[in-house]
UniProtKB/Swiss-Prot annotation:
This is Ribosome maturation factor RimM. Its main location: cytoplasm. The keyword Transmembrane does not apply. Residues 91-183 form the PRC barrel domain. The gene is rimM.
Length: 187
């Protein structure tokens, strides 16, 4: 799976520079001099080698080895750049697409989180989206229709905090919740 890391907005100047709206946390790595970027535009794929880049008004100004003038730069308008995700082994972060689709369970009563085996409790539902707010990430969980919760069949927002979501297992496609009382009853 590849993630979009940026999109060409428009040409800038007459020497082939383009304005790129970066959608990555590490534009200085993704758009570094010499990097070969994979781009897509109207179903066509292309590769471009970064000659230089610099920050400009919250975006990037990028020049490519293959683009010599404004006319050539104009043809790049709308190109979306993609790259493989970079996983940091020390980082507990997750990409949204990794969390979406996971099945959420409550932690079984009496289960110790420090043990090797996590016992699953009642099925809660499925993560259908991740929302990013100034206060942090929220998981949008569609409560299972068979649930005994008053919010059965509805979406609830769950703060994505270790205290509330102590276990995320991407291999098993599950996450475990230890919500404060009443959280799953709010819709």
């Amino acid at each position: 799976m590849e993630l979009q890391i940026g999109r060409v907005i428009k040409p800038h100047g007459v020497r082939g520079e383009v304005v790129v709206d970066p959608t990555t946390d590490t534009p200085e790595l993704r758009f570094a001099t010499g990097e070969v970027l994979k781009g897509k535009q109207a179903g066509k794929e292309l590769s471009l080698t970064v000659r230089s880049f610099r920050p400009h008004q919250g975006r990037l100004l990028v020049t490519f080895e293959e683009i010599a003038d404004r006319t050539a730069a104009e043809s790049l308008r709308g190109v979306r750049f993609f790259a493989a995700p970079v996983h940091d082994e020390d980082d507990d972060g997750f990409y949204d697409h990794e969390l979406e689709g996971l099945t959420a369970y409550l932690l079984a009563p009496g289960t110790d989180l420090k043990g090797d085996e996590i016992q699953l409790g009642d099925l809660v539902g499925e993560v259908v989206a991740v929302e990013h707010t100034p206060a942090g990430q929220l998981l949008v969980i569609l409560i299972d229709a068979e649930s005994q919760l008053p919010t059965a069949g509805k979406e609830v927002l769950v703060p994505f905090r270790h205290q509330i979501v102590p276990v995320v297992d991407l291999e098993e496609e599950i996450l475990v919740l230890t919500p404060p009382e009443g959280l799953l009853e709010l819709s």
